[in-house]
Amino acid sequence: MSGCESTPETDTPGALLYLQQTPPGQVPEVFAPGKISLANRGEFASVFSADGREFIFGVSGDDRAEVFSTRLVGDTWSEPRAVVSHERYSYMDAALSPNEDRMYFISNQPLDGEGEPKDPDLWFSTRTEGGWGPPQNAGPVLNSGRPEYYVSFTDEGTLYFTSSRAAEVGDEMNFDIHASRAVDGVFQRPARLGDAVNSEGYDGDVFVAPDESYLIFSSGRPGGFGGGDLYVSFRTEDGGWTEAKNMGSTINTDGQDYCPFVTRDGRYFFFSSNRDIYWVDASILDTYR
């Protein structure tokens, strides 16, 4: 579909990509069972690098969440390991910046790195020769006194994310999707997307197409199949967004469906549901236009 397809940025043989899993059709399947999706934990918020040689995902345990990664080394995928982790605080919802020199995520770590966990902020780590550097808070332009969640980037560097900063006091669960454009590498004051996308309830976990032609996000608005459903909205000619459309029972369940991501080659749509990561052929997105 437009905005989804691009030339794969890799010379890796196709059989080695996607952890050497058998590709899905238009019915979602659990991704890499026994390797990524395990029975004794929850997995969510996944992203592949542009060249398809690194897979980053979240793992939730009993008391905190961590960011894991596996890489294709030669013709073998490495054992997944935690790359952003803390014994007390959670790190999750990872996303890569357009040039992949930074990994953004959220954390409930206080600014001074001490004391009780706090409402989540946006953080990032810079890529180093050996992996990822120490977490750094993304600062007061992106972060507010309210929780922030889930980052996604356009090719031009606009950052989409979730925040309850616009909610009235006593209505802190009214999360909305915001966008912050980068000017000369500096993020500008975030703007809330309009009511075609946002509702009076929870709207978040947004994935934006690299060319900003569509959004996929999770919402708890009335009329869905479960506690949170995935919706899609397309860019209009005047720069607005079409009325968000529920992605239906093929994608959504009676549980929580969230954390969407479409691979850079435009082939696969990933999302999280019922404590596992799922994938499906991205051509399914054409059916919602």
Q: What name fits each language-model region?
A:
Residues 2-3:
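C-terminal motif of bacterial Sec signal peptides marking the signal peptidase cleavage site
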Residues 8-289:
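Short, conserved micro-motifs composed of acidic
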